[in-house]
UniProtKB/Swiss-Prot annotation:
<keyword id="KW-0012">Acyltransferase</keyword>
<comment type="function">
    <text>Catalyzes the transfer of endogenously produced octanoic acid from octanoyl-acyl-carrier-protein onto the lipoyl domains of lipoate-dependent enzymes. Lipoyl-ACP can also act as a substrate although octanoyl-ACP is likely to be the physiological substrate.</text>
</comment>
<dbReference type="GO" id="GO:0036211">
    <property type="term" value="P:protein modification process"/>
</dbReference>
<feature type="site" description="Lowers pKa of active site Cys">
    <location>
        <position position="130"/>
    </location>
</feature>
<keyword id="KW-0963">Cytoplasm</keyword>
<dbReference type="InterPro" id="IPR000544">
    <property type="entry name" value="Octanoyltransferase"/>
</dbReference>
<dbReference type="InterPro" id="IPR045864">
    <property type="entry name" value="aa-tRNA-synth_II/BPL/LPL"/>
</dbReference>
<dbReference type="GO" id="GO:0005737">
    <property type="term" value="C:cytoplasm"/>
</dbReference>
<feature type="binding site">
    <location>
        <begin position="133"/>
        <end position="135"/>
    </location>
    <ligand>
        <name>substrate</name>
    </ligand>
</feature>
<comment type="similarity">
    <text>Belongs to the LipB family.</text>
</comment>
<keyword id="KW-0808">Transferase</keyword>
<feature type="binding site">
    <location>
        <begin position="66"/>
        <end position="73"/>
    </location>
    <ligand>
        <name>substrate</name>
    </ligand>
</feature>
<dbReference type="InterPro" id="IPR004143">
    <property type="entry name" value="BPL_LPL_catalytic"/>
</dbReference>
<dbReference type="InterPro" id="IPR020605">
    <property type="entry name" value="Octanoyltransferase_CS"/>
</dbReference>
<protein>
    <recommendedName>
        <fullName>Octanoyltransferase</fullName>
        <ecNumber>2.3.1.181</ecNumber>
    </recommendedName>
</protein>
<dbReference type="GO" id="GO:0033819">
    <property type="term" value="F:lipoyl(octanoyl) transferase activity"/>
</dbReference>
<feature type="active site" description="Acyl-thioester intermediate">
    <location>
        <position position="164"/>
    </location>
</feature>
Length: 204
């Protein structure tokens, strides 16, 4: 699996490239993880409702084709897009989501942070505050979109929405939970490698 660092990009550009990659790939195309940092943007999943936008701002709102509700992406957040052939891997969608969640939990363990899941709300949490979100699109057994992990960012835009559709859901970030100040690139590389290891262990 290849890891590609896209640097800082507008969301729409990367979303378009994900669709192009997924439509063009064949059974021999190598899976890829794209790491990226986005300019400020709200993205709505296919289950998102307008009432989850609580106030207006100059941050753009984009309706996407991923699963889930509304979330925020911005500078200081690690985003990893998972372009993976599930059929070739031999796992289902539910298992792939579990792989992503467990990879985030394992990354946070390396910073001595105990994270957990919530049965009624997707994502990864620390003391019931959301630190990571995820949402996938599956097309012909191939995934795109992926995960976002809050690292060192302005969290105030989350106050303008019900994150992932949940009212009064608290959010947190890595810099508030550890004195370690690894760079965004370092964290993205570490999480990507953990993801690759989890995928390899679950290959059938």
């Amino acid at each position: 699996m290849r890891i590609i660092d896209l640097g800082r990009q507008n969301y729409l550009n990367v979303w378009e490239q994900m669709k192009i990659f997924t439509n063009a790939r064949n059974k021999n195309t190598q899976d890829e993880l794209w790491t990226v940092e986005h300019n400020p943007v709200f993205t709505q999943g296919i289950s998102s409702k307008s009432e989850h936008i609580l106030s207006s701002s100059d941050i753009p709102i984009i309706q996407t084709d991923r699963g889930g509700q509304i979330t925020y992406h911005g500078p200081g957040q690690v985003v990893i897009y998972c372009l993976i052939d599930l059929k070739r891997l031999g796992v289902g969608v539910k298992k792939m989501i579990e792989i992503i969640e467990n990879s985030i939990i394992d990354l946070l363990k390396t910073y001595a942070i105990k994270a957990h899941l919530k049965s009624d709300a997707p994502g990864v949490y620390v003391d019931n505050a959301k630190i990571a979100a995820l949402g996938l699109k599956i097309k012909q057994s191939r995934t795109y979109h992926g995960l976002s992990l809050n690292v060192d960012m302005d969290l105030s835009p989350f106050m303008q929405i019900n994150p992932c559709g949940y009212q009064d859901l608290k959010v947190t970030q890595l810099c508030n939970l550890t004195e370690n100040r690894d760079t965004l690139n370092t964290i993205a590389e570490k999480l990507s490698q953990i993801l690759i290891n989890h995928v390899a262990r679950n290959r059938h």
